[in-house]
């Protein structure tokens, strides 16, 4: 039984991280409401929750600027427009590995191809 590897695009990974931060911040602040009898603990929960939500906003702004600089391409598998960050990425829709580097065509997909160490080789 062969294992099918599933890749996801970098933009979607970062957006998912920011969304998790929003929900984690809200849940943390809800924990502050549950501990309202212990005032100092409630304040800590609210501050941590607020910082998480603010950090998620910063991540969303950052990924928005990255998304504007990403190269738009048409996926050869699903023929939908997607964006690529780096030398290798995955389609946002069908998870198909993509590359714009002719040297990497036909080679097994690996995210290490985006690292600076690999580019120097």
Swiss-Prot record:
InterPro entries: UPF0295
The species this protein was found in: Oceanobacillus iheyensis (strain DSM 14371 / CIP 107618 / JCM 11309 / KCTC 3954 / HTE831)
Pfam short name (any one): DUF2614
Compartments in which it is found: Cell membrane
Designated name of the protein: UPF0295 protein OB0906
Transmembrane segments: 14-34, 43-63
UniProt record similarity statement: Belongs to the UPF0295 family.
Membrane-protein topology: Multi-pass membrane protein
GO CC entries: plasma membrane
Keywords: Cell membrane, Membrane, Transmembrane, Transmembrane helix
């Amino acid at each position: 039984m062969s294992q099918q590897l599933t890749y996801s695009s970098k933009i979607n990974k970062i957006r998912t991280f920011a969304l998790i931060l929003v929900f984690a911040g809200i849940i943390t602040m809800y924990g502050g409401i549950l501990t309202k009898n212990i005032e100092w603990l409630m304040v800590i929960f609210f501050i941590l929750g607020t910082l998480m939500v603010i950090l998620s906003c910063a991540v969303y702004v950052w990924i928005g600027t990255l998304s504007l600089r990403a190269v738009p391409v048409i996926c050869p598998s699903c023929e939908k427009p997607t964006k690529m960050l780096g030398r290798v990425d995955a389609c946002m829709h069908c998870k198909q590995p993509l590359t714009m580097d002719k040297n990497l065509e036909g080679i097994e997909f690996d995210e290490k191809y985006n690292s600076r160490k690999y580019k120097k080789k």
